[in-house]
């Protein structure tokens, strides 16, 4: 598998993780959802260390992707408090 394929696989795994977490939202609170996303991202950060640094996403990029996922969840829930909670949870 070449580097471009590895990066594509990494991004697909991230999207699958975010998507599966979103579909559990009916049963989970936003904080639980965000924690699940963080576990997925942390796992992928560890996993991607086998890739060339030139093709890695750094932690900031992954957190930006997590933020986008939370915004997406917010849009699907139409709940202003959800996004405020998500931003507060994600912020260092």
Swiss-Prot record:
Keywords: Host cytoplasm, Host mitochondrion. One of its GO terms (cellular component) is host cell mitochondrion. It is found in: Host cytoplasm; Host mitochondrion. It comes from the Viruses. InterPro entries: Rotavirus_NSP6. Belongs to the rotavirus A NSP6 family. Interacts with NSP2 and NSP5. This is Non-structural protein 6. It comes from Rotavirus A (strain RVA/Human/Indonesia/69M/1980/G8P4[10]) (RV-A).
